[in-house]
């Protein structure tokens, strides 16, 4: 079947609506929408929930950009894209909760297609979701990864393990020699066996995110915490900023190609702190995190 960009766009718009409704149902606060246009073609809907009952900040962004030619930074790695018009669309979100016992979460699903007359289109899907806890709870990690594994199963026995490994490899801070969190799923360049199969998998990942995340939020959101836990959360959020600005391909691509800066940086935590040569107290719950986020088989 020929790739149907319109069908993908409708799914993504509906996914943004659904996720925002689900997060509002948990939090009570509403999202504020900011629609924007891109000079070169396309635009998007950025939605942000700030200072809610549960979430300090949640950003859910839809974008659909198109143009007559790919930027040079993109065609350098993929010469087959030169001379083609393109469309890129996706939903990307990050949720930063108030409570340090509730993990930060990130999800993204996207579709890209490049066409020129007389040639087959070049297209692929990408996406995934990952979890960044500040305090480790095994039952939460198992639930997160079990949900990821279960949504992958209809698409093949090895799909979960392959995309879990890709996620572990991708969300890694080389300069710290540590994982960003406990991972989840990450996939890119997905275009086989056919459009329908790949689109169905992208939909499963998009819908699976809230199944994986919201039960954890409900379990942890009322746990009592104090200044110590909050300070540790803000310190660990620094790793999130470091990863996004130093290693994340999507952030770098967006900033280098004249993307909308406000939407690209919507993933940043609203408050964060760094402390020179900080080491948590030995034997403390804070010290246990470094072991908890090491790569392992959760299910």
From Swiss-Prot:
Keywords: Cytoplasm, Heme biosynthesis, Manganese, Metal-binding, Oxidoreductase, Porphyrin biosynthesis. The record marks 175 as: Important for dimerization. It catalyses: coproporphyrinogen III + O2 + 2 H(+) = protoporphyrinogen IX + 2 CO2 + 2 H2O. GO terms for molecular function: coproporphyrinogen oxidase activity; manganese ion binding; protein homodimerization activity. Coiled coil: none annotated. Mn(2+) binds at residues 96, 106, 145, 175. Homodimer. Pathway: Porphyrin-containing compound metabolism; protoporphyrin-IX biosynthesis; protoporphyrinogen-IX from coproporphyrinogen-III (O2 route): step 1/1. Substrate binds at residues 92, 108-110, 258-260. This is Oxygen-dependent coproporphyrinogen-III oxidase. Belongs to the aerobic coproporphyrinogen-III oxidase family. The active site is at 106 (proton donor). Residues 240-275 are annotated as: Important for dimerization. Gene3D superfamilies: Coproporphyrinogen III oxidase, aerobic. Its main location: cytoplasm. Its EC number is 1.3.3.3. Involved in the heme biosynthesis. Catalyzes the aerobic oxidative decarboxylation of propionate groups of rings A and B of coproporphyrinogen-III to yield the vinyl groups in protoporphyrinogen-IX. PANTHER family: COPROPORPHYRINOGEN III OXIDASE, MITOCHONDRIAL, OXYGEN-DEPENDENT COPROPORPHYRINOGEN-III OXIDASE, MITOCHONDRIAL. GO terms for biological process: protoporphyrinogen IX biosynthetic process. It is found in: Cytoplasm. Its cofactor is Mn(2+). One of its GO terms (cellular component) is cytoplasm.
